[in-house]
Amino acid sequence: MNYIFNLSYFMILLLLLYPLILPLCQKFFDKNLEKHTKWAIKLSFFISLIPLTLFIDQGIQTIIMNISWIHLPLFNINLSFKFDMYSIMFTSVALYVTWSILDFTSWYMYSDPNINRFFKYLLLFLITMILLVTANNMFQLFIGWEGVGIMSFLLIGWWYGRADANTAALQAVIYNRIGDIGLILSMIWLATNLNSWEMNQFMVLSKNLNLTIPLLGLILAATGKSAQFGLHPWLPSAMEGPTPVSALLHSSTMVVAGIFLLVRLNPLFQNNKEILTVCLCLGALTTLFTAICALTQNDIKKIIAFSTSSQLGLMMVTIGLNQPYLAFLHVCTHAFFKAMLFLCSGSIIHSLNNEQDIRKMGGLNNILPFTSSCMVLGSLALTGMPFLAGFFSKDAIIESLNTSYLNAWALILTLIATSFTAIYSLRLISFTMMGHPRFLPVSPINENHKLLKNPLKRLAYGSILAGFIITSNIPHNKSMIMTMPPLMKLMALLVTIVGLLLALELANLTTKQFKILPNMKMHNFSNMLGYYPPIIHRFLPKMSLKWGQTIATHTMDLNWYEKTGPKMTELNQKIIKIIHSPQKGVIKTYLTLSLLSIITLLVFFNLSLNHS
């Protein structure tokens, strides 16, 4: 059995590396790199189903493969791969989603002269993520962690001729570097206190230790990578990259890496109530804040980006509930409909001549029926519509939150955010699909290409069936609550319906404005992203520079200029007085100095004679 698992993943690794290595040997191969890359991803997906089927059929828990790598007197680092429910399931989901995204990329970026290099970057992005999820030691995980960070920088800044793209890429790196500090400090603590980076070892050795400090470092790392509140601004800014990058970044690679880190290391903090409370409150604040920001955005990609951040907050809430299985389930189901939403937005942007403002769309239901249907399906799955993929994970999370007897504040914030999800999803559909067309009549509208339709079909099937298939085949790691009041059971659906009704009512109120200049404070708060970017990116740097300049100039005025100016003259006068005081023409002074000189010489000669 171990042989089959190891062979399957070795073949997947070879297939994924094949399009990257072969162009180095054969120059003509580079012309067909796009085709070979898609075939490699497709074959890798079907091969990944072999260990997944065996895992489900045989009821296997974990298989670990170790390869000796670095040996030191007191510390060893091995190449260690862990094949369990999390890594096997996520690998298949990531390959399936990436296969669809690469097909879409062939259509979306066909005119880009560097499309082959773009495919290589996407492939490396996927490889580093698979390395991260299969890692069984912190050093190997760190390599994958930094790999997805580097590739995100290259892909977000793909159109490097645009200043906004360069700024967004740099912003992503800086915010993630803050999170990386937490991961590095946690690794240092584990190495110095437990003398091991092997996950299985330090989970056993740390049972009687206080792990609050390293766990806070891990939360900081997840906050940066998964765009939790405080380190979240890079995620909407990352929409400056090409749409396929946004789809891959938000569905199955970088942004879920932080959540996956906490899921993988959950045994470390499942009994640490303070850390679980931090995760719960951080996730609740993130999911509500980003849902509020999504309500008034007008860029179609930024609305979907903020919805991703809101769902990541929901996953963090689930970690805080000590339910890593549900967090991982939501990661898997979320990948399908979030990738589909981004591909639909890419189709709309491409058809409307690169227009991203939803106020300049409308009436696309009749013009782009297939894209519109997939967009509606993805939005319904996002809101948790019964029996779609999002329902199976989102409903279970809300149920766990309702029955947890934990923080009521976090429960209320999460329920409000769930309601807001329905509002911004309906707003997105209303502005883009309904009403009259508000775009230029000469737009190059076309959705008949197979490289557009086939990926959307595959992701649509996943958005419908993935939740049912995953929950039916993967066992729960905790006993489920079998009975609960109907109101509690239907809470997720009820708040979604309330959100839809509220959205419709707000839409009606827009034509009934009572004041010429209405009070727009809440709208401005949402539209300006809670004033977070202006404060963090403008006000604080400006104040820092101003204080630095003030301190520098005052220091020079008070010290340097004064020391070299008036005080230097005063010092010179003192020195002149000291030198001038003996030279007053008084005979007693001269005789005293001569006598002292003679006595000094006599003492010196006397000492010299005694020594000799």
UniProtKB/Swiss-Prot annotation:
A Pfam family per the record: Proton_antipo_N
Single annotated GO MF: NADH dehydrogenase (ubiquinone) activity
Catalytic activity: a ubiquinone + NADH + 5 H(+)(in) = a ubiquinol + NAD(+) + 4 H(+)(out)
Membrane-related topology note: Multi-pass membrane protein
Main subcellular localisation: mitochondrion
EC number(s) reported in the record: 7.1.1.2
Entry keyword annotation includes Mitochondrion: yes
Subcellular location: Mitochondrion inner membrane
PANTHER family: NADH-UBIQUINONE OXIDOREDUCTASE CHAIN 5
Family membership: Belongs to the complex I subunit 5 family.
Name of this chain's protein: NADH-ubiquinone oxidoreductase chain 5
